[in-house]
Design a protein with these regions (language model features):
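Activation loop entry of protein kinases
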Residues: 1-2, 14
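Active-site activation/catalytic loop segments of kinase-like enzymes and analogous catalytic loops
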Residues: 13-57, 72-89
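C-terminal, non-catalytic tails of nucleotide-sugar-dependent glycosyltransferases
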Residues: 52-55, 59-63, 110-120
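All-alpha amphipathic helical-bundle segments outside canonical DNA-binding/catalytic cores
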Residues: 60-72
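Regulatory N- and C-terminal appendages and interdomain linkers associated
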Residues: 84-120
């Protein structure tokens, strides 16, 4: 089963950066890892993970990473906002709709703080 809502044809780096979002999201917010001790957990740091991705894909780096990091978090906030709308209309199908809708603002705030930090 495929979920076409999030399917894209475009820059594969955007998909990788979407995956990196877990490093910047607070623990307890979806699959957020921010603030956890990666070494203790045996998880590579964000920089180590990016370096491994670049090595395996033959890239010198991810020059648009800051922009894409902000974009993917805002995109997730927009998706959560859509779920909030479905919840308000009584058409939300997920048992987790209420919890998902509740993180709209925290995600938007995270994206905005990343934009400010990156001076975008």
């Amino acid at each position: 089963v495929l979920d076409w809502e999030l399917s894209t044809l475009g820059d594969p780096v955007a998909d990788f950066v979407y995956h990196l979002m877990m490093y910047r999201m607070p623990a307890g917010l979806f699959t957020g890892l921010a603030g956890l001790d990666f070494a203790e957990l045996g998880i590579p740091s964000e920089e180590e993970y990016v370096a491994a991705y670049c090595q395996r894909t033959g890239r010198d780096g991810l020059p648009d990473r800051d922009y894409l990091s902000v974009f993917v978090v805002f995109r997730l906030a927009a998706i959560c906002h859509g779920i909030r709308g479905r919840l308000a209309r009584g058409s939300a199908s997920s048992a987790h709709a209420e919890a998902t809708a509740a993180v709209t603002e925290p995600l938007a705030e995270l994206a905005w703080s990343q934009a400010l930090a990156a001076r975008l």
